[in-house]
């Protein structure tokens, strides 16, 4: 690697690409994964790893923006922590590299870049997590020092001398916040010491504390179905408002979207609404429920929105009427955006005409306009909601 002057600071070429690189310095071997690190030499035996966040985690970038880690990321970090248990055989340098892989995403959530400063001349700080001021964020610029203290014995206590060394190193390096990470136990006097009034903030983290940190950042499982329902409802509400203002908007909607808009409109007018499935709906698209004279009443709404501008004929009308009668419902409403044929109602009796009402595009627009007024507080539902349905 061409080391010329052991005492001089000399930059080493950046390792580009995504291949695995192995760099040997003296007797130590450092393996670099797929993080595209930049490597610089600061003396004969010491290296510093600067880990850049822009090259990793593309698949979970949304979660990072929301301040969360995916379940897969958290599980991977838990596995790394298992390697740091006191009965493992890692040497101090290997333990630091494992810890670095854990710290990287945890600090990255808050916009920090993690720099590994460990080695023979680490000056008491193994990692520096730095965040620069950003115009797009209110987070202040800050550098946090992290010192690792790992043991191979199953039961080990972190000595007060280690804590005092960390405080001294932090003050010498003008750090205002430091973290001591260990797989050992922190004695009571250590916790008492960090709670005292000091010119810097000190945090003590054992393996359990690290796991708790990961758990807090775990992205909760999203109820996708509920999210979709909310989005569709918001879309339906927006389309209803658009139709109320510009009726021609109906010409640009598919039949299922019109059904969803009508369902949203009737719910906004005070009905309890059930939108039936897109297929095998049993001959009705929307089921409306309301109270009439103290009794529960149920009505079927069928909607025809054919992009071919086809009008509804008598067969479809008779089919809906038959379903209403056979299922003993209180009535129904047939909406057709392009109207009905001239003979669509010829076979209907007076009773049937009373039980089943009809409406075209103008009727749908009127419903949407009433919906907008209701949402603005300019319209209140009548005591008998069927007046809205059959007006």
UniProtKB/Swiss-Prot annotation:
**Any Pfam family the entry gives:** Mrr_cat
Segments forming a coiled coil: none
Domain of life of the organism encoding this protein: Bacteria
Might you name a Gene Ontology BP term for this protein? Answer: DNA restriction-modification system
Q: Which GO terms describe its molecular function?
A: DNA binding; restriction endodeoxyribonuclease activity
Q: Does the keyword Iron apply?
A: no
Answer yes or no on keyword Nucleotide-binding.
no
Keywords, A to Z, come to: Plasmid
Q: What is this protein called?
A: Uncharacterized protein y4cE
């Amino acid at each position: 690697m061409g080391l010329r002057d052991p005492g001089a600071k000399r930059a080493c070429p950046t390792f580009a690409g995504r291949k695995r690189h192995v760099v040997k310095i003296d007797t130590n071997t450092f393996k670099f994964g797929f993080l595209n690190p930049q490597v610089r030499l600061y003396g004969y035996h010491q290296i510093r790893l600067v880990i850049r966040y822009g090259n990793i985690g593309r698949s979970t970038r949304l979660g990072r923006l929301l301040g969360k880690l995916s379940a897969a990321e958290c599980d991977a970090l838990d596995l790394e922590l298992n390697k740091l248990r006191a009965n493992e055989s890692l040497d101090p340098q290997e333990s630091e590299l494992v810890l670095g892989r854990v710290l990287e995403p945890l600090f990255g959530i808050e916009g920090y870049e993690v720099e590994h400063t460990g080695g023979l001349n680490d000056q008491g700080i193994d990692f520096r997590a730095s965040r620069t001021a950003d115009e797009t964020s209110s987070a202040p610029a800050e550098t946090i020092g992290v010192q690792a203290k790992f043991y191979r014995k199953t039961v080990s206590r972190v000595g007060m001398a280690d804590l005092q060394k960390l405080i001294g190193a932090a003050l010498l390096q003008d750090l205002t916040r430091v973290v001591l990470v260990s797989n050992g136990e922190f004695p009571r006097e250590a916790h008492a010491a960090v709670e005292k009034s000091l010119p810097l903030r000190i945090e003590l983290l054992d393996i359990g504390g690290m796991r708790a940190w990961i758990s807090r950042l775990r992205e909760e499982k999203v109820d996708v179905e509920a999210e979709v329902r909310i989005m569709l409802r918001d879309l339906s509400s927006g389309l209803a408002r658009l139709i109320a203002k510009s009726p021609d908007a109906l010409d640009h909607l598919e039949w299922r979207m019109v059904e969803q808009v009508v369902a949203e409109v009737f719910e906004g007018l005070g009905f309890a609404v059930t939108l039936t499935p897109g297929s095998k709906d049993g001959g009705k698209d929307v089921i409306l429920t309301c109270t009439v004279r103290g009794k529960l009443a149920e009505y079927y709404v069928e909607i025809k929105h054919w992009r071919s501008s086809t009008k509804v004929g008598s067969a479809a009308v008779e089919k809906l009427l038959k379903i209403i009668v056979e299922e003993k419902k209180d009535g129904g409403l047939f909406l057709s955006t392009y109207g009905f044929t001239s003979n669509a109602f010829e076979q209907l009796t007076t009773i049937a005409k009373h039980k089943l009402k009809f409406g075209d595009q103008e009727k749908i627009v009127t419903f949407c306009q009433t919906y907008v007024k209701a949402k603005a507080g300019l319209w209140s539902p009548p005591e008998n909601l069927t007046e809205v349905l059959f007006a």
